[in-house]
A protein has these predicted regions:
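Small-residue helix/turn framework positions
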Residues: 4-191
Length: 191
């Protein structure tokens, strides 16, 4: 619908087998310059399958994904670009595993962990038999500034331990710069 400063995007909704995207926003026209703002949510019951459908290999298996976003870029909605992308994305992956991770030594921690014992009582043995790194959740947020996505709070809560990540992804230059720390879950294994 029309607004005093451009067009209001009342509702955008995209749905496929593995994902649901919905949002709303504005398309502004100020002094002959277009800009777009889009707020909404994206969810997927199987995020790995969603990415595979886009021909993007991720190594994520059996994990639900939920996110909220508030994004803006200079230009029209159909002229999306990383160079002027700004905003915030809060996201969460739950209960899955990463298949592309070497798990040498991590299985012993997952066998002894109290959190893992609860999963065994629920007859969930994926963290023992599946090759990769099992996690309870991965949560974080990205602040985007002209196509550079910064995070200070990404946390991977895994059966073998906890991983924290801080740093950035430069979407324009396709570069990564992260500090990653791993803390094994030794205390949850002690009597």
């Amino acid at each position: 619908s029309r607004s005093a400063t451009g067009m209001k995007i009342d509702q955008v909704r995209l749905n496929n087998t593995h994902g649901l995207f919905y949002g709303s926003g504005n398309w502004f026209l100020t002094n002959g310059q277009s800009s777009t703002r889009l707020k909404g949510e994206f969810s997927s019951a199987d995020f790995g399958a969603f990415l595979k459908g886009l021909k993007l290999g991720s190594g994520i298996k059996d994990s639900e994904f939920n996110s909220k976003f508030d994004l803006s870029w200079k230009r029209a909605p159909h002229e999306f670009n990383f160079e002027t992308l700004n905003g915030q994305i809060d996201w969460r992956l739950s209960d899955g595993y990463l298949t592309e991770v070497s798990d040498q030594g991590s299985r012993i921690f997952s066998l002894l962990s109290l959190d893992s014992l609860v999963r065994k009582l629920q007859l969930d043995f994926r963290d023992v038999f599946v090759k990769g790194f099992f996690y309870e959740k991965i949560i974080g947020s990205f602040q985007l500034d002209n196509g550079v996505a910064y995070t200070q709070d990404t946390l991977v809560d895994g059966g073998a331990g906890e991983i924290t990540m801080q740093g950035y992804t430069d979407l324009n230059a396709q570069q990564l710069n992260y500090q990653i720390a791993f803390t094994p879950n030794v205390t949850s294994s002690l009597p």
